[in-house]
């Protein structure tokens, strides 16, 4: 006998609330995706190929990297492995959210919002769970993930079909577009930041700084993740040890 489908708890956030809460992400995604569409066509990809990247890969800054590598003649495997190394942090997003979610999850809905779990969507979901985890719902998550994905695809369509070189005379604007995603991600993280996490954040920053100074950006990402996670584990064990005595 099949288990009953989990129902949203009374007072939980709705799909439309998720769409509404995605507005800051949508506003930042459209211009960056627009720049990606322009850049991809400038590198020789067709408008349809550019849109395909955004629909299927949906990897933000990694899309700029993979299109540049493919245009330069790199093999598909090398480009794919490079992007996987850059985005390895996404492996931790699901477990991190799951540890805070108190509701039962429905596999079909989870698969939908998991596809759209970008840095910014993850940060927004974390902030929601930190403020009030009882209001979090999969319908809300689908709303924010779907709206964000749609805005990314929409921005790519506009950029890819508007013609190459539209921002060529405005380098400052093009540089600012590339900074919008990191700035948005940091704003969400600061909104959910708690003082007790200071040590973990410091360790992650030190690890990332050492990685980027001594090696490369992918190594810096891995080093930051490892240092932050190890510090969190040590801190949790140290704080929990007295209770076991």
UniProtKB/Swiss-Prot annotation:
Highest taxon of the lineage: Bacteria
One Gene Ontology term of the biological-process aspect is:
L-valine transmembrane transport
A single Pfam family it belongs to is AzlC
Q: Which residues lie on this side of the membrane: Cytoplasmic?
A: 1-24, 85-109, 162-172, 227-245
Q: Which UniProt keywords apply?
A: Cell inner membrane, Cell membrane, Membrane, Transmembrane, Transmembrane helix, Transport
Membrane topology term? Multi-pass membrane protein
Question: Per the record, what ranges lie on the membrane's Periplasmic side?
Answer: 46-63, 131-140, 194-205
* Location(s) in or outside the cell: Cell inner membrane
Where does it mainly reside? membrane
InterPro entries assigned to the protein according to its UniProt record, in alphabetical order? Brnchd-chn_aa_trnsp_permease
Q: Does the record's keyword annotation contain NAD?
A: no
| Spans through the membrane | 25-45, 64-84, 110-130, 141-161, 173-193, 206-226
- GO CC terms on record? plasma membrane; transmembrane transporter complex
The family note in this entry says: Belongs to the AzlC family.
Q: What is this protein called?
A: Inner membrane protein YgaZ
Taxonomic path: Bacteria, Pseudomonadati, Pseudomonadota, Gammaproteobacteria, Enterobacterales
Name of the gene this protein is made from:
ygaZ
């Amino acid at each position: 006998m099949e288990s009953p489908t989990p129902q949203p708890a009374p007072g939980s956030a709705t799909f439309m609330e998720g769409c509404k809460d995605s507005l800051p992400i949508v506003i930042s995604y459209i211009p960056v995706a627009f720049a990606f569409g322009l850049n991809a066509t400038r590198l020789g990809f067709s408008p349809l190929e550019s849109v395909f990247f955004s629909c299927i890969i949906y990897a933000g800054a990694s899309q700029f990297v993979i299109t540049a590598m493919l245009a330069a003649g790199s093999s598909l495997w090398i480009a794919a492995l490079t992007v996987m190394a850059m985005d390895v942090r996404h492996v931790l997003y699901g477990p991190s959210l799951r540890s805070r979610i108190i509701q039962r999850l429905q596999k079909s809905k989870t698969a939908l919002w998991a596809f759209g779990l970008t840095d910014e969507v993850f940060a927004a979901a974390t902030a929601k769970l930190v403020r009030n985890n009882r209001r979090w719902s999969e319908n809300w998550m689908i709303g924010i993930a779907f709206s964000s994905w749609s805005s990314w695809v929409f921005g790519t369509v506009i950029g890819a079909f508007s013609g190459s070189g539209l921002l060529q005379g405005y380098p400052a604007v093009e540089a600012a577009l590339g900074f919008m995603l990191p700035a948005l991600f940091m704003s969400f993280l600061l909104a959910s930041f708690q003082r007790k996490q200071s040590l973990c954040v410091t360790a992650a920053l030190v690890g990332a700084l050492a990685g980027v100074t001594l090696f490369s950006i992918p190594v810096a990402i891995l080093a930051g993740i490892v240092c932050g996670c190890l510090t969190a584990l040590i801190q949790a064990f140290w704080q929990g040890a007295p209770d076991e005595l």
